[in-house]
Regions:
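Multi-bladed beta-propeller domains
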Residues: 1-17, 47-68, 83-84, 93-112, ...
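Conserved beta-strand position repeated across blades of beta-propeller domains
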Residues: 22, 71, 115, 160, ...
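Residue position within the beta-strands of beta-propeller blades
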Residues: 29-33, 78-82, 122-126, 166-169, ...
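Residue-level detector of Asp-centered blade-edge/turn motifs that repeat once per structural unit
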Residues: 25-26, 74-75, 118-119, 161-163, ...
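Solenoidal tandem-repeat scaffolds enriched in leucines and small polar residues
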Residues: 16, 23, 33-43, 48, ...
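Loop/turn-rich, solvent-exposed surfaces of beta-rich toroidal or solenoidal domains
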Residues: 376-396
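Blade-level signature of beta-propeller repeat domains, shared across WD40, Kelch, NHL, RCC1
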Residues: 420-450
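Structural motif
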Residues: 40-46, 87-92, 132-138, 174-179, ...
Length: 450
């Protein structure tokens, strides 16, 4: 027998990315993560009663990503969940009988699954970067305190405990940067920048001779650089923290990037020849995914200081920030003539939008860019190259003059998500893009877990 407890139009993105359902031990309730409405970028935790079909909103996060991974305690009296912003992920608990939220721990890596121990005293959780790279299992008391890294659980996420048995998923993702010659069927795609870890966020220098990118080959996300043929690898940053999204200045002398090294995500600028990074944003709110104005005077970035992600800009020499978008905005680039700002809206809203740099109303230009691929596009003189995943994932060119789209080529493997993934060479002859070339998963069992 099947019963419908809510209709399709009553929820928004319950199964997207971090979607997880959790049954209460007595089977009367279901906890899940969803958007309260389409105007809220952050997800919240909701509780569905199977007896009354009533839905109760439990959390009201003021972060750009929100709450997910709800997990009932063994006695059903307490709910634990993750809360994530651009800066950090925290573990929270709440007594379902009433009371305030309690934050147990926060950190720069993302939460990948929660599991209560049988006695209800501790919570086991996975901690990792995007796509669960550099993961490990940890344990923390339900009252907070210092977490304990378990002796097992390397590359471990999504733990589950039943009795004295613990199972978890061990996952390894391999993302590499590929190169392809445009407008030529004689040159197939080839792997350009690769390792056994994560290589993403490529961007050509203005003269096309160098490529800046982000990599985890050192153990953490850092900025790296190489020649356009993939040779001459050099590590640019050494923050030992989540650092990425490199963007060249128009004159090629500087690189802007974001880093969580200060505790909250901030925008930095470093000389392309090396040296000490200069912090540009100083607010306590997050600042991520920078890009330069065509004249080099401004750096655009995304910030959640208003309660959701919007595009802001700050003088490249330093100074006060000014808000640019007002209806949500994230990864942004100016048009080649500097008249328009193109932008995607981040993790929860699909499409590419445009607003005049002199001010005005926003207009949706492309609707078929998935929300999870906010960094998989590049603006050129007469259009935009972007990833279309409606059928087989492919790179498509949208001509802004004719408003027509042309399929350029199909991807060999799955595209990477939640990361910048595409750049076009200055001479428009070459495209670099990221692919998820390998994703291995194993189910691991630990006996006699205490």
């Amino acid at each position: 027998m099947r019963e419908t407890y809510w209709q399709e139009n009553e929820f928004y993105q319950i199964f997207w990315f971090f979607g997880r359902l959790s049954w209460s031990p007595d089977g009367k309730y279901l906890a899940y993560s969803d958007h309260a409405n389409l105007d809220e970028s952050a997800t919240s935790i909701f509780l569905l009663s199977f007896d009354s079909s009533d839905i109760r909103r439990l959390t009201f996060p003021r972060t750009s990503i929100g709450d997910y991974n709800p997990t009932f305690s063994r006695d059903g009296q307490t709910l634990a969940w993750n809360r994530t912003s651009q800066d950090e992920t925290s573990i929270y608990t709440m007594a379902l009988s009433g009371g305030d939220e309690q934050r147990l721990i926060s950190g720069q890596q993302f939460g990948w699954g929660l599991a209560w121990t049988p006695d209800g005293r501790d919570i086991v959780f996975g901690k990792a970067g995007w796509l669960a790279n550099a993961a490990w299992l940890w344990k923390i008391s339900r009252n907070g305190g210092e977490p304990e890294r378990l002796q097992f659980g390397q590359e471990g996420v999504q733990p589950s405990i039943r009795g004295n048995r613990l199972v978890y998923s061990r996952q390894m993702a391999n993302i590499n940067i590929w190169r392809r010659t445009l407008n030529s069927s004689d040159h197939p795609s080839e792997m350009l920048i690769y390792s056994t870890r994560m290589e993403s966020g490529p961007q050509f220098s203005p003269d096309g001779k160098m490529v800046a990118f982000e990599s985890t080959r050192s153990g953490n996300y850092e900025i790296w650089m190489c020649r356009s043929d993939g040779s001459g690898l050099v590590q640019v940053t050494h923050f030992n923290s989540m650092t990425g999204t490199p963007r060249w200045s128009p004159d090629g002398r500087q690189i802007a990037f974001d880093s969580r090294a200060p505790g909250n995500a901030a925008i930095f600028v470093i000389d392309a020849q090396g040296g000490s990074p200069r912090r540009l944003t100083t607010e306590t709110s997050s600042a991520v995914v920078p890009s330069w104005s065509r004249d080099g005077r401004w750096i655009y970035f995304a910030s959640d200081r208003t309660g959701r992600n919007e595009v802001w800009k700050i003088p490249s020499a330093g100074g006060s920030s000014a808000q640019v978008t007002h209806h949500s905005g994230f990864a942004a680039f100016e048009s080649s003539d500097g008249k328009f700002l193109y932008y995607a809206k981040g993790a929860s809203v699909p499409g590419i939008w445009r607003v005049p740099t002199s001010g005005g109303e926003e207009v949706e230009i492309i609707g078929s860019l998935d929300a999870g691929h906010w960094g998989y596009w590049a603006a050129v003189e007469n259009g935009i190259y972007y990833l279309d995943t409606k059928a087989k994932p492919a790179i498509v060119f949208f001509n802004t003059n004719t408003r027509r789209s042309t399929r350029v080529f199909d991807l060999e493997n799955r595209p990477a998500t939640q990361a910048p993934g595409l750049t076009i060479s200055p001479d428009k002859k070459t495209i670099l893009y990221t692919q998820l070339d390998a994703l291995s998963r194993e189910i691991m069992l630990v006996e006699n877990f205490r």
